[in-house]
């Protein structure tokens, strides 16, 4: 049985036409439909022409949002030796080695991002069942397995995000807050599009971009004209 929509959602859906909107118009409409009583995130959902069950069609990488994420990212670091001090000085919220691994193993996950140095990954790998489903497992592709902790912490705190295509080939990403100006949201969305194009999997055949929708956390889905976004040139 289909879930009955609230009157609020019904009213918001009526504002959205069944068309692919020009990027700026879509973002303005997303802001207009962000009527919840909290600071809603700006979400983008992108369906790509890939089948991630094949290794050469997987997409997992990072993007730096030029206008930031609009939220404070809690960064935890698993390291040892002098790297512990480096991470602390760089502003990591949690730093540790065996003690932090033990806490995580008990289900204490009070961070949004986990970074680790390569030498501790054999121990971190044991946490895969806990971290993997939450998208928190450090990886070289995601920039979260590194010896340059200071740079990694700085970038992720400033708006760098790791993303991946799920098993159906869809990328789900938060690219800011609905309170951002349209211009800021557009800059961030353009950065996401360019990153996905730049990191096109070698095995991707045929039509790469299938559909792109944006929405507020509690708002209706709004289709964006993909070609218009890809052709868009932002003035610096």
Swiss-Prot record:
InterPro entries: Ribosom_uL1_bac-type, Ribosomal_uL1, Ribosomal_uL1-like, Ribosomal_uL1/biogenesis, Ribosomal_uL1_3-a/b-sand, Ribosomal_uL1_CS. One of its GO terms (biological process) is regulation of translation. The keyword Ribonucleoprotein applies. Pfam families: Ribosomal_L1 (PF00687). It comes from the Bacteria. The keyword rRNA-binding applies. GO terms for cellular component: large ribosomal subunit. Gene3D superfamilies: 3.30.190.20, 3.40.50.790. Keywords: Repressor, Ribonucleoprotein, Ribosomal protein, RNA-binding, rRNA-binding, Translation regulation, tRNA-binding. GO terms for molecular function: rRNA binding; structural constituent of ribosome; tRNA binding. PANTHER family: 54S RIBOSOMAL PROTEIN L1, MITOCHONDRIAL, LARGE RIBOSOMAL SUBUNIT PROTEIN UL1M. Part of the 50S ribosomal subunit. Binds directly to 23S rRNA. The L1 stalk is quite mobile in the ribosome, and is involved in E site tRNA release. Protein L1 is also a translational repressor protein, it controls the translation of the L11 operon by binding to its mRNA. Belongs to the universal ribosomal protein uL1 family. This is Large ribosomal subunit protein uL1.
């Amino acid at each position: 049985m289909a879930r009955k929509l609230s009157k609020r959602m019904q009213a918001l859906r009526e504002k959205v036409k069944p068309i692919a909107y020009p990027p700026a118009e879509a973002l303005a409409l997303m802001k207009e439909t962000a009527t919840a009583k909290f600071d809603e995130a700006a979400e983008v959902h992108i369906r790509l022409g890939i089948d991630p069950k094949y290794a050469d069609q997987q997409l997992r990488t990072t993007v730096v949002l030029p206008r930031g994420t609009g939220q404070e990212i809690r960064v935890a670091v698993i390291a040892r030796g002098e790297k512990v001090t480096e991470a602390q000085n760089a502003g990591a919220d949690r730093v540790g080695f065996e003690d932090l691994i033990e806490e995580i193993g008990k289900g204490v996950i009070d961070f949004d991002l986990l970074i680790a140095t390569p030498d501790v990954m054999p121990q971190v790998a044991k946490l895969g069942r806990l971290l993997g489903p939450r998208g928190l497992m450090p990886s070289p592709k995601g920039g979260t397995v590194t010896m340059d902790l200071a740079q990694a912490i700085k970038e992720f705190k400033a708006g760098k995000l790791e993303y991946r295509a799920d098993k159906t080939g869809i990328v789900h990403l938060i690219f800011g807050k609905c309170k951002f100006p349209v211009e800021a949201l557009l800059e961030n969305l353009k950065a996401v599009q360019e990153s996905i194009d730049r990191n096109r999997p070698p095995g991707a055949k045929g039509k790469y971009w299938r559909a792109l929708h944006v929405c507020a956390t509690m708002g209706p889905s709004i289709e964006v004209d993909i070609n218009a976004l890809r052709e868009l040139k932002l003035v610096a």
